[in-house]
Amino acid sequence: MPAWLLAVAEPVTEATEGSAEKGILDAILESNLINIAIILSLLYILGRRVVGEALAKRREGILEELRQAEQRKQEAIERLAEEQQKLAQAQQEAERIRKQAEANAEARRQELLQQAEREIERLRANAERDLSAEQEQILQELRRQIVRQALSKVEQELPQHLNEQVHQRLIERGIQMIAR
């Protein structure tokens, strides 16, 4: 029997030997104390094992949860490292694409500038050609007008200066020029 049970039971037995006449109430009280002591002893003996097993199971459960949490933490760290690596690669790819886009835009800008320069040169050449053609046309028109005016003036003045001899000489010269 455990020592604490003996310590509780000893005063109870002394009380029962010295006072048998105290009555039924004392007997009930004494028996209740004994019953409580027995129940507490049984609870201690049986409960220690049950509580110990429950605590051991709980401890194992907590340890398992800690192991799983540590494993999840490690997996999360690995995934984080992978995702950070992917992010770094994506940022490098984005930077490469941005630089390529800038290079393409610059090349396109240069191409458009060259195209515009060629178009300007073509328009200048066309304008010069059109201007030359128009100048030539205007000169020809001026020559025609001058010839018409000269002919008109000659026709007006010729009859006044022309006599029969001069007329005959002009005809002969014209024939000689044709004959040559």
UniProtKB/Swiss-Prot annotation:
| InterPro entries tied to this protein | ATP_synth_B-like_membr_sf (IPR028987), ATP_synth_b/b'su_bac/chlpt (IPR002146)
Q: Give the keywords, sorted.
A: ATP synthesis, CF(0), Hydrogen ion transport, Ion transport, Membrane, Thylakoid, Transmembrane, Transmembrane helix, Transport
Q: Which Pfam families match?
A: ATP-synt_B (PF00430)
Q: What's a GO cellular component annotated to this UniProt protein?
A: plasma membrane-derived thylakoid membrane
Keyword ATP-binding among record annotations:
no
Main location per the UniProt record: membrane
Cellular compartments annotated: Cellular thylakoid membrane
Topological category with respect to the lipid bilayer: Single-pass membrane protein
Where are its TM segments located? 33-51
**What GO molecular function annotation could you give as one example from this UniProt entry?**
proton-transporting ATP synthase activity, rotational mechanism
NCBIfam families with a match to the protein in the record: PRK07352.1
Record text on subunit structure and interactions: F-type ATPases have 2 components, F(1) - the catalytic core - and F(0) - the membrane proton channel. F(1) has five subunits: alpha(3), beta(3), gamma(1), delta(1), epsilon(1). F(0) has four main subunits: a(1), b(1), b'(1) and c(10-14). The alpha and beta chains form an alternating ring which encloses part of the gamma chain. F(1) is attached to F(0) by a central stalk formed by the gamma and epsilon chains, while a peripheral stalk is formed by the delta, b and b' chains.
Record's family? Belongs to the ATPase B chain family.
The protein's role, per its UniProt record: F(1)F(0) ATP synthase produces ATP from ADP in the presence of a proton or sodium gradient. F-type ATPases consist of two structural domains, F(1) containing the extramembraneous catalytic core and F(0) containing the membrane proton channel, linked together by a central stalk and a peripheral stalk. During catalysis, ATP synthesis in the catalytic domain of F(1) is coupled via a rotary mechanism of the central stalk subunits to proton translocation.
* Name of this chain's protein: ATP synthase subunit b
Which organism does this sequence originate in? Synechococcus sp. (strain JA-3-3Ab) (Cyanobacteria bacterium Yellowstone A-Prime)
Q: Which gene encodes it?
A: atpF
